[in-house]
Amino acid sequence: MQSNLSSFNKIEQKINGSRKISNYLIGGMLSIGGIGFILAAISSYTGRDLLPLGNPSTLLFIPQGIIMGAYGVIANLLNIYLWYLVFINFGSGYNFFDKDSQSVEIKRKGLFKDIEVKLSFDEIKSVKLDISEGFNPRRRIALVLKGRKKPLPLSGAGELKPLLQVEEEGARLAKFLNVNLEGLK
């Protein structure tokens, strides 16, 4: 979440989506692996080596070739889905806070349509820091809304910033919105 202060009365935070290096690496590995498994399955069926490494033509088509073909098809389906998410930049968007109009606008790129939430400052109860350490750590800033049990997350999914930076951003936002900051122990 990159914070850009255009003036003292407005805050705009850009949220990064699925265009991350890790998604490009996983997509590349899935592409190579899926195509490799399909070529190995075709090689075992036709008896000709279509891969430069190994000797897949010696594999029995039933059951090894069929299983490798199924793995290749599954990998390529996952690969198409992942590249689609990267192409549309799933999860990207922005958070916009405006003191002049007392409004908050949260916009994210969804799978099939954009998600847009507009709130007034009166609907915001507090800013919450959701911090959990361990095997699957999470450091996220969220808005606690009046009349809603679950907080509305502001940070992008998969962002793991230093704890001090998350606390500073949460405190700055709580001060800007003139609400309490929850989650600090």
UniProtKB/Swiss-Prot annotation:
Q: Which GO BP terms, alphabetically?
A: photosynthesis
For the keyword Metal-binding, the answer is: no
Q: Which UniProt keywords apply?
A: Membrane, Photosynthesis, Thylakoid, Transmembrane, Transmembrane helix
Q: Which Pfam families does the entry mention?
A: Ycf4
Taxonomy, superkingdom: Bacteria
Protein location: Cellular thylakoid membrane
A Gene Ontology cellular component where this protein is annotated is: plasma membrane-derived thylakoid membrane
Describe the function of this protein: Seems to be required for the assembly of the photosystem I complex.
Q: Which family does it belong to?
A: Belongs to the Ycf4 family.
Q: Which residues cross the membrane?
A: 21-43, 65-87
Q: Which NCBIfam families match?
A: PRK02542.1
Leader sequence range is none
Question: What name has this protein been given in UniProt?
Answer: Photosystem I assembly protein Ycf4
The membrane topology of this protein is: Multi-pass membrane protein
